[in-house]
């Protein structure tokens, strides 16, 4: 009794309870055993269709007319056919005799137009089955997409019409019925003419034999076996009402759409009544709702037969009998087509069986008593339920109460579609369907008897999915229940709300719906799985990997293409450009260089590639905004001067530097010109080599009226790299003018103090943090970046860089190198930054807040190219902005880490080659130490190669003086040593123990890093996990057995270099002179050794002089 209020109530069907006379003494097992009816012959009217055997399982009806081609045929036209065969009434079973009066029958009308009679006293055995030959009760083309687009009209069996809106997912009652259409004007709109009609046909049947006695229609009556008709025989009067509407074009006569609905009505005529003057049955559910109401507990004695209650499942096409005591299933009969109507013939009366009776019979009396009010409310709610079903591809509606009568009907409603001023409110049924089956996926049960009925489902879904927009999207759902609530109808006069109902107490002994194989839907299943996988992958990548292109291999990226920007135009641009020209300021950068492209930006500046107008060679120009504080600016300039003096074959160096102080807002307006084009993708953080766009100025004159800006984006056709050294472009610039290709290093005026704090570094202002990439040692989220990676190099691995530093390799203008590989030059921007702030005491809350922002990594937020971005707190600069321009050498980018990643086996790493590489690294480190400097951040990603395979040590962001006193170090590096570098696992992996623990350290930290680099050169790793684990063990002097056996001499040297005590580590000069390198034989060994000794000697003398006069990084 709780089924009306719980979600599982309607999964099987809404069943009507009628009490029939039955046999109380029979058990459930005996009832099931005897409840299987034998196939019977059936009378065929008109077409003489053969009888279709049915049983307790679903079997398709033979000779059933396809729903898509149903034509309503009145029975009166058949007698005039020549050679017509007399219709043959159904033959009773062998053991069946004519039933005397008083016996009960269950009469069932199905959608295929057949009438069947079941004997409830004989376990539901089919008494007779009759096909009157007039076709299906429902046929329509209104639901096809080509008729009304995304809307479809669904007819009801009683003549009402509903409209399904797929976009709104709602069911609306159409304010006209079939009869109103027929009564309206024949012309419907300008392009539609309505034709059709309503036909009534009456059939006289023998109540207990099912033989057709006569058929009457508008054309007359015809009788069969009138002589044999017994005067005392009971007669069943069946009246079929069929309504048909067709819409045709007035000019062509082509049919546009049609639909036809019909239903049967039944009346019982006892033997004492006359059959003359038959009047239409009084049992119409629309006219007398009292006889169509749900049978309550008071009326159960009328529908009970020996304590057996009859119920009909509309969704499962079943008629079932339950025992009143215990609610056990006594018998059931399965039809092969949907049930349209049902009647109980008992004691000379015809009782309509409501198809939406949801009363549940259970032995739990306590539940019924405790929830009596809820059950009564649910019974009243489901009394007005609507069932949306599908038969042979055609959607239809069934309801125990005509919902359309609750609302006004307008015969000319469709004519208002063309009238914009016409407003007709349409009642709406919210689309919250109640699936009739408790288990949507059927259990596969093998049975030959089910095959015929299963084919009906298959035909229905196949035809419907091809011809209409599917509402029933699941193949194992024959329909949905749409219960209509009176309470909500009173609150909302124009809305019908659908609610989910369930009944957990529904009898579980009822047999599940017949199974349907899933093999037919394998394509849909596979497509759904693939779509889910693709959608999930896409969502995960977008949510957790916002920049997947940055994870590509550097060898797969491109440097630039010739994808051009449109010329900057518009009144706003002209206004800004006029202001720039009228300022009268002339930039040295724009005077001496022709900007080619923007290579990227880092935490402290923007890097451009520019061509010198004098020598036609390409350089890397880096623009840095200097801090406003004098002390911080002084330290920046001192470090730049010191690094510019480093000249060694194994060390990259700077070329030139100058300062520019443009007028206020001048630099911002220049940058704004470049950011006008929305197609320029400037990331919030520093661009990676994979997505950094290249911008090229073709023609822009500060004093011209028009300017032309072109973009050079990444291109797969570009060569491997930028050239080592400064390449000589043999072709002179075709453009005589140049443009201010610059980006404001500080587009937010509120971070000036933050920059001051950030520039109070012991490390170089030109450097940023370069993090070792890898699975376990940092996920490339450092601060250095390397632009324009090699496309063809097999060693390059993906890396995400945000460096503000530039390390350039051999200088000079090598024409030969440029001619051989004119576009193989590569720029490396990857010098390490300290990420350390000066230990200063903020003088105000603002400066303290800004210092906090500067300390927080990553630092790219201190330099933003987004000129439209405003912060909530702005500070006006106390002095004009000053920019430092540094002219640096373009160099090839292929670091040692990429080289090792491309050689993952010992066989691929020859001992002599690895030692040769290491020796060159040691030579460069020895030169640094001889100059009184220490690198402090040696690792494979900071070691580079020239075009002729000469090793270069770069990324001098953490270079500092070896003799720097403790006081200055405190001033310049307030953070712990391990935090001063990057705080990332990648760099920390190569740091010495004293750096990690924050203790004081010396130049021996570079020796510790050299030991790890030598080990990694000789001992390859297959995975990053193995690399991290092994290097961690080696730091603790736990070497792999393979390394100690294969390289005994190198093992001893590495063990000394990795000593926990800095005093026990050898000097760089001792490493170079180690006996391990004596046996090496490679070209240029002698020259390299002599050059190294010469530079070291001169460097030592210079260092001594510097110590007497001033240090490379003098302190205040």
From Swiss-Prot:
GO terms for cellular component: cytoplasm; cytosol; endoplasmic reticulum; endoplasmic reticulum membrane; membrane; mitochondria-associated endoplasmic reticulum membrane contact site; nucleus; perinuclear region of cytoplasm. Changing residue 397 to N: Decreased tetramerization and activation, leading to decreased ability to phosphorylate EIF2S1/eIF-2-alpha. ATP binds at residues 599-607, 622. One of its GO terms (biological process) is endocrine pancreas development. Residues 1-29 form the signal peptide. It catalyses: L-seryl-[protein] + ATP = O-phospho-L-seryl-[protein] + ADP + H(+); L-threonyl-[protein] + ATP = O-phospho-L-threonyl-[protein] + ADP + H(+); L-tyrosyl-[protein] + ATP = O-phospho-L-tyrosyl-[protein] + ADP + H(+). Keywords: ADP-ribosylation, ATP-binding, Diabetes mellitus, Disease variant, Endoplasmic reticulum, Glycoprotein, Kinase, Membrane, Nucleotide-binding, Phosphoprotein, Serine/threonine-protein kinase, Signal, Stress response, Transferase, Translation regulation, Transmembrane, Transmembrane helix, Tyrosine-protein kinase, Unfolded protein response. This is Eukaryotic translation initiation factor 2-alpha kinase 3. The gene is EIF2AK3.
């Amino acid at each position: 009794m709780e089924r009306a209020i719980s979600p599982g109530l309607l999964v099987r069907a809404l069943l009507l309870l009628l009490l029939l006379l039955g046999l109380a003494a029979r058990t459930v097992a005996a009832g099931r055993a005897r409840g299987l009816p034998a196939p019977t012959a059936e009378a065929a009217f008109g077409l003489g269709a053969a009888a279709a055997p049915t049983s307790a399982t679903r079997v398709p009806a033979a000779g059933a007319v396809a729903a898509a081609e149903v034509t309503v045929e009145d029975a009166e036209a058949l007698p005039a056919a020549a050679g017509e065969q007399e219709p043959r009434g159904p033959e009773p079973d062998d053991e069946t005799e004519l039933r005397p009066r008083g016996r009960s029958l269950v009469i069932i009308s199905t959608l295929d137009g057949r009438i069947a009679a079941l004997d409830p006293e004989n376990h539901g055995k089919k008494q007779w089955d009759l096909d009157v030959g007039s076709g299906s009760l429902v046929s329509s083309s209104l639901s096809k997409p080509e008729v009304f687009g995304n809307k479809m009209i669904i007819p009801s069996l009683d003549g009402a019409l509903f409209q399904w809106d797929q976009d709104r997912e709602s069911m609306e009652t159409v304010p006209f019925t079939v009869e109103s259409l027929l009564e309206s004007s024949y012309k419907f709109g300008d392009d539609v003419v309505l034709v059709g009609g309503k036909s009534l046909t009456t059939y006289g049947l023998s109540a207990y034999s099912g033989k057709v006695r006569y058929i009457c229609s508008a054309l007359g009556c015809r009788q069969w076996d009138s002589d044999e008709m017994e005067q005392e025989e009971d007669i069943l009067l069946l009246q079929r009402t069929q309504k048909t509407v067709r819409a045709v074009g007035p000019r062509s006569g082509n049919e546009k759409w049609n639909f036809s609905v019909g239903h049967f009505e039944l009346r019982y005529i006892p033997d004492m009544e006359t059959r003359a003057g038959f009047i239409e049955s009084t049992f119409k559910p629309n006219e007398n709702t009292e006889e169509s109401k749900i049978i309550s507990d008071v009326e159960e004695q009328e529908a009970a037969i020996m304590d057996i209650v009859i119920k009909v499942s509309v969704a499962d096409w079943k008629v079932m009998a339950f025992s009143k005591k215990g609610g056990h299933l006594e018998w059931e009969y399965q039809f092969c087509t949907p049930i349209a109507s049902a009647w109980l013939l008992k004691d000379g009366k015809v009782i309509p069986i409501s198809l939406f009776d949801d009363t549940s019979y259970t032995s739990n009396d306590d539940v019924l008593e405790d929830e009596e009010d809820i059950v009564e409310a649910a019974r009243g709610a489901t009394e007005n339920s609507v069932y949306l079903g599908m038969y042979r591809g055609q959607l239809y509606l069934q309801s125990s109460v005509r919902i359309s009568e609750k609302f006004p009907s307008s015969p000319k409603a469709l004519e208002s579609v063309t009238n914009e001023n016409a407003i007709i409110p349409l009642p709406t049924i919210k689309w919250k369907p109640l699936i009739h089956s408790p288990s949507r996926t059927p259990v596969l049960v093998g049975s030959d008897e089910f095959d015929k009925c299963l084919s009906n489902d298959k035909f229905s879904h196949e035809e419907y999915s091809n011809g209409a927009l599917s509402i029933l999207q699941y193949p194992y759902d024959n329909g949905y229940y749409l219960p209509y609530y009176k309470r909500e109808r009173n609150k909302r006069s124009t809305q019908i709300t659908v609610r989910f109902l369930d009944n957990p107490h529904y009898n579980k002994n009822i047999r599940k719906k017949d199974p349907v194989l899933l093999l037919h839907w394998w394509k849909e299943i596979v497509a759904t799985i693939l779509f889910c996988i693709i959608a999930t992958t896409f969502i995960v990548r977008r949510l957790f990997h916002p920049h997947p292109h940055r994870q590509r291999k550097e060898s797969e990226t491109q440097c630039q293409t010739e994808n051009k920007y449109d010329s900057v135009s518009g009144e706003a641009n002209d206004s800004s450009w006029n202001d720039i020209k009228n300022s009268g300021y002339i930039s040295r950068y724009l005077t001496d260089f022709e900007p080619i492209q923007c290579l990227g930006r880092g935490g402290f500046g923007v890097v451009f590639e520019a061509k010198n107008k004098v020598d036609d060679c390409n350089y890397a120009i880096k623009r840095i905004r200097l801090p406003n504080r004098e002390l911080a600016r002084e330290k920046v300039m001192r470090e730049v001067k010191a690094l510019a003096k480093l000249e060694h074959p194994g060390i990259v160096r700077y070329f030139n530097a100058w300062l520019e102080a443009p007028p206020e807002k001048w630099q911002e307006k220049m940058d704004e010109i470049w950011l006008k084009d929305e197609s320029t993708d400037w990331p919030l953080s520093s661009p990676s080599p994979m997505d950094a766009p290249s911008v090229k100025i073709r023609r822009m004159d500060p004093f011209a009226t028009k300017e032309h800006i072109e973009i050079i984006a990444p291109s797969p056709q570009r060569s491997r790299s930028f050239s080592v050294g400064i390449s000589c472009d043999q072709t002179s610039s075709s453009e005589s003018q140049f443009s201010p290709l610059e980006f404001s290093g500080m587009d937010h005026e509120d971070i000036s103090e933050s920059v001051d704090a950030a520039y109070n570094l012991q490390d170089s202002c030109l450097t940023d943090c370069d993090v070792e990439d890898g699975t376990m040692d940092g996920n490339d989220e450092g601060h250095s970046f390397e632009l324009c990676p090699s496309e063809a190099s097999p060693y390059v691995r993906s890396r995400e860089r945000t460096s503000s530093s530039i390390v350039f390799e051999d200088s000079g203008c090598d024409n030969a190198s440029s001619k051989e590989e004119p576009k193989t030059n590569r720029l490396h921007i990857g010098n390490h930054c300290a990420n350390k702030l000066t230990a200063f005491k903020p003088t105000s809350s603002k400066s303290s807040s800004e210092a906090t922002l500067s300390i927080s990594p990553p630092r790219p937020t201190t330099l933003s190219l987004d000129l439209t971005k405003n912060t909530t707190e702005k500070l006006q600069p106390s002095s004009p902005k000053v920019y430092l321009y540094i002219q640096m050498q373009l160099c090839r980018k292929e670091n040692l880490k990429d080289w090792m990643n491309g050689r993952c086996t010992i066989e691929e790493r020859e001992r002599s080659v690895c030692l040769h590489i290491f020796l060159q690294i040691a030579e460069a480190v020895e030169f640094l130490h001889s100059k009184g400097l220490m690198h402090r951040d040696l690792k494979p990603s900071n070691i580079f190669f020239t075009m002729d395979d000469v090793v270069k040590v770069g990324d001098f962001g953490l270079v500092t003086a070896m003799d720097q006193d403790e006081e200055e170090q405190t001033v310049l590096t307030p953070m712990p040593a391990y935090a001063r570098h990057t705080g990332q696992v990648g760099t920390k992996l190569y740091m010495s123990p004293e750096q990690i623990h924050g203790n004081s350290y010396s130049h021996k930290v570079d020796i510790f890093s050299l030991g790890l680099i030598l080990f990694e050169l000789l001992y390859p790793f297959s995975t990053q996990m193995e690399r991290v684990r092994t290097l961690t063990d080696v730091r603790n002097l736990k070497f792999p057995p393979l390394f100690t056996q294969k390289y005994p001499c190198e093992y001893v040297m590495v063990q000394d270099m990795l000593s926990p005590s800095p005093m026990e580590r050898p000097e760089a000069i001792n490493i170079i002179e180690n006996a391990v390198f004596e046996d090496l034989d490679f070209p240029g060994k002698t020259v390299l050794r002599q050059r190294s000794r010469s530079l070291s000697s001169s460097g030592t003398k210079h260092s001594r002089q510097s110590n007497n006069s001033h240090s490379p990084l003098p302190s205040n």
